[in-house]
A protein has these predicted regions:
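Surface-exposed cleft-lining segments at the edges of enzyme active sites
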Residues: 7-13, 38-41, 104-107
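Alpha-helix N-cap/loop-to-helix initiation residues
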Residues: 11, 44-45, 76
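Histidine-acidic metal/acid-base catalytic patches
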Residues: 23, 49-68, 74-182
């Protein structure tokens, strides 16, 4: 779930309203024995790790936990290692996709600036047993030819439109390569 979209630069103006509404959601989830997973989506209260931590401090427990999305943090200008350190005790679900800080383009896991391999390693070393959800938002993937050459080549590479199957296969293969190196 997302918290709420907030006009840019207005987090403090809407903070109380966001927390009131999120509290209502968490109360409902608690009453119905459900778990809400909050994602760090761009443009919401909670796109940056600091706001996610504030939400976790207020509501984290059996019925409210965090989703960690590497690409969304990169696209929001958030250092993912810093985000992980702030949120590691609340992460229950991981969206596996990466992004380039230079332009925000989504790329296969490990090919961007999200520190995916390092953070996955830390998660597993800390006993993470949650899900890894592939998010192959790669249908208009720039840099297909640069996959073997690294992220600089990807940023400058050709564009190829991928089918859903191709995008999922690429996302899956990229994750497997990272996991095999651990």
């Amino acid at each position: 779930m997302f918290s709420f979209y907030i006009p840019e630069g207005k987090n403090e103006v809407y903070r109380a309203q966001v927390f009131d509404r999120m509290g209502q959601f968490v109360d409902y989830a608690t009453a119905n024995d459900a778990v809400l997973l909050h994602e760090n989506e761009k443009g919401i209260y909670g796109e940056k790790a600091k706001e996610c931590r504030e939400l976790m401090d207020a509501f984290s427990g059996e019925h409210f936990k965090a989703i960690f999305d590497f690409a969304n943090f990169v696209q929001a200008g958030q250092d993912t290692l810093e985000a992980y350190e702030l949120l590691k005790d609340s992460i229950a679900y991981v969206h596996v996709k990466d992004a380039l800080a230079a332009n925000g383009n989504v790329v296969p896991a490990g090919m961007g600036d999200g520190n995916v391999a390092d953070i996955l390693k830390r998660l597993f070393e800390n006993g993470y047993e949650g899900f890894l959800s592939l998010e192959p938002h790669l249908f208009n993937f720039s840099g297909f030819a640069g996959l073997e050459k690294g992220k600089d080549a990807i940023a400058e590479g050709e564009t190829k439109v991928l089918s859903g199957f191709e995008a999922f296969s690429l996302a899956h293969e990229s994750l497997l390569r990272l996991l095999e190196k651990m």
